[in-house]
Amino acid sequence: MLEPRGADIPILFLVLVVLPVVAYILLGKWSNISEKRVRANLLAQMAAEEALRAETVVNADRGVRFESVATENRAQRTRTKTVSAGGGAVRAEFDAGARETVAEQRSDSVTATCGVTVVAPVNNNELHVCARCFGPAKTRCSRCKSVRYCSGKCQIIHWRVAHKDECVPVESCSSSSERVSFEKDSVLYDHGMDSTMYSNNTTQAAKGKTSKSSVDFASLGISQNDITPQINTQGRKSVGKQHSSKANRESCRRDSATVFDSSDEAASAGGDNKTSHIKHKSRGNSYAAETNPRRHSVDSSAVQMNGQSFVSGMQESHKHENNLGVRSSFGCPNTQYPSNGTRTATLPRTGINKSGEQSCTETSKKGQVAAVSKTVRSKDTGISEESNGISSTMGIMKMMGLRNSTKHDDRYKNLKMLFPYEEFLKFFQCEVFDLSPRGLVNCGNSCYANAVLQSLTCTKPLVAYLLRRSHSRSCSGKDWCLMCELEQHVMMLRESGGPLSASRILSHMRSINCQIGDGSQEDAHEFLRLLVASMQSICLERLGGETKVDPRLQETTLVQHMFGGRLRSKVKCLRCDHESERYENIMDLTLEIYGWVESLQDALTQFTRPEDLDGENMYRCSRCAGYVRARKELSIHEAPNILTIVLKRFQEGRYGKINKCISFPEMLDMIPFMTRTGDVPPLYMLYAVIVHLDTLNASFSGHYISYVKDLRGNWYRIDDSEIHPVPMTQVMSEGAYMLFYMRSYPRPQRGEHNGKAPVHHSQPRNEMKEQRKPVNRFKPRADHKNTESSSSEWSLFTSSDEASFTTESTRDSFSTIDYTDVCHVVDSSSPFAIFNNVYHNVEPSPHNTVACRMFSGTKPETRYFVEQETNHNNTVVLDATPSLYPIPAPYPPHDYYDQSMYVNYETNPEFNNGQDQDRTYSYW
């Protein structure tokens, strides 16, 4: 065999290893050099463009060709020869007026240049003229670099006369390099805009034609062709290398914030021996411009000399949400809609009122900013606009070609809503009658899921939203979606047939929680929390998830509108009487039922009664600078639209169950358990009950069933696939585990005072588990760091029901002895008998006497109602005193309930018309 020689190995190494490495290094360096060269060329090009822009700003509106000056001089000489004996004075006045006109036009040009880029390259070989004597200019203003002078004397005189009020530094002006022409498709008002607002001069300027002054010099015997050419400061248009001094000013649309609606009009009053002068009046009296992330309110009557900011009539309007109007020097209100990082514009509208006087109407709007709806109230100061006088902000922004801002003021964050509350009100108040409950197949210990799904499908606002199928139309998820699955499930309820199956929901829920859907018996409450949390995450998925959305915005989703409420925790130091409050969102209430609790009202009373913090749970007061005894009290600040109450029947750690009978009302009054400073809720109507049927009082085994009231008001007992209609008495006699209540009318939209929570001033010494007042909430606020931060009720869907699990165990179960041997079942002969409290039993009256009794921790309260029965499905409607508030209104006034009324359960003189007898109600 032929073997390679030893001399070939170095050559092969050189060819196969060294040369590729060297080539790779050289190619890398060559690539870097090429990139640097391209970058250098790009920087040089950008520098050249910047220089061109600076030169454009300097010379665009000030460069006048020398031949135009010569034409003016010839016109002046002609007028001197033509005018009669009194012409000398007329000529002097005309010259002064012409100079004043040029000064005003240049002032308007300087103002227009700020915020609007005008790109019209000017030939450097042109001769510039002096701003005062119109002679050949040799120097220019060192500050604005836009006005030329022939000598220092002219510069000083012109500065004192006019230029000191109009000089604006170059740095404050915009440097954009694009031009915008007012074509037919550029910037237009909405269809309500009056076409007569634009004059012929403006129309000609939009078409790029030269406009002439409308000055009438007939009395002087001078033709308009002999007059000094008017320098239109609206912009310049260059055609090839020729530049006309009569070109119209153009506005720039690239990220520009100013829309000009102005056309210079000239009018003169002349006579034989009377002075004549030129007046220029702008149609657009004022405008708003913004060239920096900071907001600038621009007033046409006042511009600061430093050019950094503009003066307006109401420069501090951003401090007040309702004061959004900016008045100009002409008394015309201009509406400004500030937004950080966004250049906004004010479009003033003019009109003629009945008296013939010209007035300006404030532009009002109601729309969305950055795809988030917010409402702005406006006041009309002139004529009313067409239709309802409301225009969309997005329409204005699209009309002007502006982009949405990514940064906004903090004060507008409180007004943003991920899901409009008005849409939720429509879902809450709509009527759905074509749905009927259908059974669900037990997929293997799935009774807990079936009971929860049956309760959710009877939740009216959720069902109305799912029937609309608005989520599936816009859902971008490629994988399985819970909301889409629920929509399909609700749509199948409209069809008649056999039992449905929730196997798809259970199988996908297992990917979220490994313990759900694997065939083992689980807790219905845990499954409900999982469903609600999943729906909430889906609502936030489009915006990047829970971690990227502001906590305040997370409270404005559809799920929060339905199940979200607000809880207040108040801690009072018993030494210095210092109080600190904190507000937290809640999604449901978990109530203890041990001890003396025999009714739902008792459980709520125990939940809201004050608790002393002492011993190991002492409170650290910042004012006392130590651990002191304190008193803590929980109360509901805002009642949710859908109130979910969980009765804590399962024992913690022993797998036992409190199997006592807890009475609950069909109509629940939450006023005694509210803070009375926030929401004033109406009655809550019961629509679903989940019951846990056990054996041997054990929590690790059993069966879940549900009682639901369909949207027609009929009650059904649903046991997986079996459905049976039942009377109300059977529902009220069951040992409920979960209760679902819905408000009789929706909660008013949250105000700004509810958006901020006070900062707590104290920290706990030791972690403590408060099993007495557990509360489930969805999302902790990031700025809440206070005393109860380690308490169980402040965790995500708190582990307040730590015993509410049903995992199998080999431990011996025990039967919890009921605290009462008597099951207090409310007599349902009267629909109001459910309000009877165990402390004060009232015998049912044959005349259906209404005695609404609620007990709080300190004093009892009552609520009087007028019982009415409509013809629709025998629905009982509760109303307050007719003089206070009618039921059809969406929101009641704050004085809907007289909370200072002393308790009088048997009689009410107001209803009895002065008679000393019990008020009785009969059906009609």
From Swiss-Prot:
Residue spans of biased composition, Basic and acidic residues class: 247-256, 764-773
EC identifiers of the protein: 3.4.19.12
Which chain segments does UniProt annotate as zinc-finger regions (MYND-type)?
Answer: 130-167
The identity of this protein, by name, is Ubiquitin carboxyl-terminal hydrolase 15
Q: Which domain of life is it from?
A: Eukaryota
Q: Where are the transmembrane segments?
A: none
Classification via InterPro entries: Papain-like_cys_pep_sf, Peptidase_C19, Peptidase_C19_UCH, USP_CS, USP_dom, Znf_MYND
